[in-house]
Amino acid sequence: MNTARLNQGTPLLLNAVSKHYAENIVLNQLDLHIPAGQFVAVVGRSGGGKSTLLRLLAGLETPTAGDVLAGTTPLAEIQEDTRMMFQDARLLPWKSVIDNVGLGLKGQWRDAARRALAAVGLENRAGEWPAALSGGQKQRVALARALIHRPGLLLLDEPLGALDALTRLEMQDLIVSLWQEHGFTVLLVTHDVSEAVAMADRVLLIEEGKIGLDLTVDIPRPRRLGSVRLAELEAEVLQRVMQRGESETRLRKQG
């Protein structure tokens, strides 16, 4: 793709957002502001509300209470500017790679699809079937499918969780480089704290349906694996997660 930015990043504002499932409170009056173009990672224990937050932003769920805004506009009104990637690339096996990238598009989209594939290093695989691709290559196709829509907001729900270590690092670098080039806003949900710290400007820890930790990652890019500062920030987040886990264990024993 060319070096022009695809779109201006979407600014996000969540005001007192709650999400309940019957008696289960997953998000509890959560307040959050994400400036346009920021890369944010969300971590936390399973069941803490990370994926629910992503689903609200993707328009797959509606909040029980509160407002989800893109600046001053309800995010639901500009949902076409939002794209989401999952751990499973969700490619249609009966369609070629390029047809998966252009899925749902009308008109003359093939040139744009080829540019999107070139941006993720798969320009020579356009005519192949998904079955011929590795797991990492399938995720590159999913990323190209997101890029062709010129997103203002890219939501990543553990998209690298099933990849081997080396492929995962390559995909991390690719996502960060495309974000730097095009300026969209990114929200990454991950269980991997080292991944969160390595990729994001900011790491959020969700606890009891609210933001329990909001950590700025003030490390210049490109970031070097093995950096002492990266290790310190990772340890800070992990310590907070573990403290919370120990508190919950004590409460269960007392109960």
Curated annotation (Swiss-Prot):
Start and end residues of each ABC transporter domain: 12-233
Reactions the enzyme catalyzes: ATP + H2O + aliphatic sulfonate-[sulfonate-binding protein]Side 1 = ADP + phosphate + aliphatic sulfonateSide 2 + [sulfonate-binding protein]Side 1
Alphabetized InterPro entries for the sequence: AAA+_ATPase, ABC_transporter-like_ATP-bd, ABC_transporter-like_CS, ABC_transporter_ATP-bind, P-loop_NTPase
SMART domains the UniProt entry points to: AAA
EC number: 7.6.2.14
Any Gene Ontology biological process: sulfur compound metabolic process
Binding sites annotated in the UniProt record for ATP: 44-51
GO cellular component: ATP-binding cassette (ABC) transporter complex, substrate-binding subunit-containing; membrane
Enzyme class: translocase
Keyword tags: ATP-binding, Cell inner membrane, Cell membrane, Membrane, Nucleotide-binding, Translocase, Transport
Known function: Part of the ABC transporter complex SsuABC involved in aliphatic sulfonates import. Responsible for energy coupling to the transport system.
Similarity comment: Belongs to the ABC transporter superfamily. Aliphatic sulfonates importer (TC 3.A.1.17.2) family.
Subunit text: The complex is composed of two ATP-binding proteins (SsuB), two transmembrane proteins (SsuC) and a solute-binding protein (SsuA).
Protein's recorded name: Aliphatic sulfonates import ATP-binding protein SsuB
